[in-house]
């Protein structure tokens, strides 16, 4: 009898375990659980108005209102408000139902912090126009420095403007050509001098 009771108890436990597994709702990727149902998520640009009524079925979704967006599949009850550009920024990408508005600092200013929560800064100017990298919306101007200031490292670069650089190159070329010509003339004179000495010795 004891053995029979153990078998009955094991059978009962197994049945309970199987029933528990059957009651667990496993949702697929792109679905969300609502009560005991798996509902499809809303697509980008829409939000959830009402969950589905049948398992693995579509939910009732509604499009985002003007100046609102959602850029991914979701089960949100409302869309997110689009960003608003400040007066020191300009719009580079418009707000849509599937993408937020993109703003950046206006020309001549920059902001190098994440999300640019502070005001845009005026771009630095370089003395004598020695610019290594021009200023843009996210980075300040980088200048070349002849002498490093205390605590700073400067690149020891002696840079020339384009017209001056061309003049220097031409002058160097002329000097080299002149030196070669002078060397050739000296060699010719030396050879002639040697011939004259040899001729005088023969005549004597």
Curated annotation (Swiss-Prot):
Q: Where are the TNFR-Cys repeats?
A: 27-61, 63-103, 104-143
Q: Where is the signal peptide?
A: 1-19
Report the record's disulfide bonds.
27-38, 39-52, 42-61, 64-79, 82-95, 85-103, 105-120, 123-135, 126-143
Origin: domain of life: Eukaryota
The cellular location(s) given in this protein's UniProt record come to: Membrane
Main site of residence?
A: membrane
What protein name is recorded for this chain? Answer: Tumor necrosis factor receptor superfamily member 26
Q: What is the lineage of its organism?
A: Eukaryota, Metazoa, Chordata, Craniata, Vertebrata
Please verify whether the record's keywords include Transmembrane.
Answer: yes
Q: Which organism is it from?
A: Mus musculus
Q: How does it sit in the membrane?
A: Single-pass type I membrane protein
Q: What keywords are annotated for this sequence in UniProt?
A: Disulfide bond, Glycoprotein, Membrane, Receptor, Repeat, Signal, Transmembrane, Transmembrane helix
- SUPFAM superfamilies the UniProt entry points to: TNF receptor-like (SSF57586)
Q: Which residues lie on this side of the membrane: Cytoplasmic?
A: 186-204
Q: Which Pfam families match?
A: TNFR_c6
Per the record, what is one GO cellular component?
membrane
Keyword DNA-binding present in the record's keywords: the answer is no
Q: In which tissues is it expressed?
A: Expressed in thymus and spleen. Detectable levels in lung.
The residues exposed to the Extracellular compartment are 20-164
Glycosylation (residues): 57, 136
Residue ranges of the TM segments: 165-185
């Amino acid at each position: 009898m004891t053995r029979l009771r153990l078998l009955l108890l094991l059978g009962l436990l197994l049945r309970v375990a199987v029933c528990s597994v059957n009651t667990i709702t496993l949702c697929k990727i792109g679905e969300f659980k609502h009560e005991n149902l798996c509902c499809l998520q809303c697509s980008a640009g829409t939000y959830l108005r009402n969950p589905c009524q049948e398992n693995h079925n579509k939910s009732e979704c509604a499009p985002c209102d003007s100046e609102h967006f959602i850029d991914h599949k979701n089960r949100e009850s409302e869309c997110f408000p689009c960003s608003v550009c400040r007066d020191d920024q300009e719009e580079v990408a418009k707000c849509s139902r599937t993408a937020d508005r993109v703003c950046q600092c206006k020309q001549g200013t920059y902001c190098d912090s994440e999300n640019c929560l502070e005001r845009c800064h005026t771009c630095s100017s370089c003395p004598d126009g020695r610019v290594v990298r021009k200023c843009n919306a996210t980075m300040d101007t980088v200048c070349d420095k002849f002498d490093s200031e205390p605590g700073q490292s400067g690149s020891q670069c002696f840079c020339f403007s384009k017209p001056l650089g061309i003049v220097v190159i031409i002058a160097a070329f002329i000097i080299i050509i002149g030196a070669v010509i002078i060397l050739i003339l000296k060699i010719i004179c030396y050879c002639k001098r040697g011939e004259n000495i040899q001729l005088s010795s023969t005549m004597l």
